[in-house]
């Protein structure tokens, strides 16, 4: 049995999956954001209950908005203050007497999609989230590639390519990132970036869904904004694809619901790739909010 946890800033979602990768148990509770002992006890309690209900000791995987420090195993996260700097994996293993695997929630999203029946035959799958932030995860042969420092897939903290910057025109804003660097693509390619770029150019604070609805009516500012955003996004993705050369790209997050992406991106990206390179297949995520739990559970599958 495979146990998966999606530990977020407001809730903990749990799922148990059998050998056929079918979900057989679910639980959702509030995240004890500021009480570390309660956070650990909550996770342990859910696991022990699942063990009793299912009659086995499941393999435990946890996805969270952050990562483990590759040097000492401490948790690096800002969304769950109680866990920041703590040794969550080691403390859970000590209480449970079994191995626990922890990974970034974007990696879990990518793994969930890579294990979908439609993609299991693909050699490599790049999952990209265009939500509150921009990030991703890379899966090779059914397993997450995290890199030496556990930061592989932190694509949002790469910098804007110069031609993407030029595509924004003379009034291009230089946003400062939460990591204290300037020009990180997280602040431009995310849903949040989509909104703050619109506010920068047009002086109006609109939600992404409002801008997209205006675009559908042919409203001039929205049409101009979407065209500029698409070109910038295409250049940045071409840059990423040139370095990683994935077989399939799966888009998640709020902006992934904008159907125009799947029409526009392939032809725009093609202009910015090497002449010998083909644009990888770009598809919409299938598992939505369940992806984090699925991917966390599948961290322990040995393909």
UniProtKB/Swiss-Prot annotation:
GO terms for biological process: N-acetylglucosamine metabolic process; peptidoglycan turnover. The keyword Repressor does not apply. The keyword Kinase applies. PROSITE patterns: ROK (PS01125). Transmembrane segments: none annotated. Keywords: ATP-binding, Carbohydrate metabolism, Kinase, Metal-binding, Nucleotide-binding, Transferase, Zinc. It is an enzyme of class 2 (transferase). Gene3D superfamilies: 3.30.420.40. It catalyses: N-acetyl-D-glucosamine + ATP = N-acetyl-D-glucosamine 6-phosphate + ADP + H(+). It comes from the Bacteria. Pathway: Cell wall biogenesis; peptidoglycan recycling. This is N-acetyl-D-glucosamine kinase. It comes from Photobacterium profundum (strain SS9). The lineage of its organism: Bacteria, Pseudomonadati, Pseudomonadota, Gammaproteobacteria, Vibrionales. The gene is nagK.
């Amino acid at each position: 049995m495979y146990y998966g946890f999606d530990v977020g800033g407001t809730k903990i979602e749990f799922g148990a999956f059998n050998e056929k990768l079918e979900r057989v148990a679910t639980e959702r509770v509030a995240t004890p954001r500021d009480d570390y002992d309660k956070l650990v006890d909550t996770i342990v309690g859910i696991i022990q209950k699942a063990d009793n209900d299912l009659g086995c000791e499941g393999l435990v995987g946890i996805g969270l908005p952050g990562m483990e420090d590759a040097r000492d195993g401490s948790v690096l996260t800002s969304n769950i203050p109680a866990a920041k700097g703590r040794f969550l994996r080691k403390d859970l293993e000590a209480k449970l007497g079994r191995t626990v695997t922890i990974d970034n929630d974007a990696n879990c999203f990518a793994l969930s999609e890579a294990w979908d029946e439609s993609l299991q035959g693909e050699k490599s799958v790049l999952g990209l989230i265009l939500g509150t932030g921009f990030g991703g995860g890379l899966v090779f042969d059914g397993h997450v590639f995290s890199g030496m420092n556990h930061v592989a897939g932190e694509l949002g903290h790469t910098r804007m390519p110069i031609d993407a910057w030029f595509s924004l025109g003379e009034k291009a804003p230089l946003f400062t990132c939460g990591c204290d660097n300037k020009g990180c693509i997280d602040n431009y390619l995310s849903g949040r970036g989509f909104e703050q770029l619109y506010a920068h150019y047009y002086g109006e604070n609109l939600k992404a869904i409002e801008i997209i609805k205006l675009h559908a009516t042919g409203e001039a500012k929205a049409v101009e904004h979407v065209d500029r955003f698409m070109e910038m996004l295409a250049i940045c993705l071409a840059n990423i694809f040139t370095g990683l050369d994935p077989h399939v790209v799966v888009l998640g997050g709020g902006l992934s619901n904008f159907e125009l992406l799947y029409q526009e991106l392939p032809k725009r990206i093609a202009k910015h790739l090497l002449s010998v390179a083909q644009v990888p297949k770009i598809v919409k995520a299938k598992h939505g909010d369940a992806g984090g739990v699925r991917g966390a559970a599948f961290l322990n599958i040995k393909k």
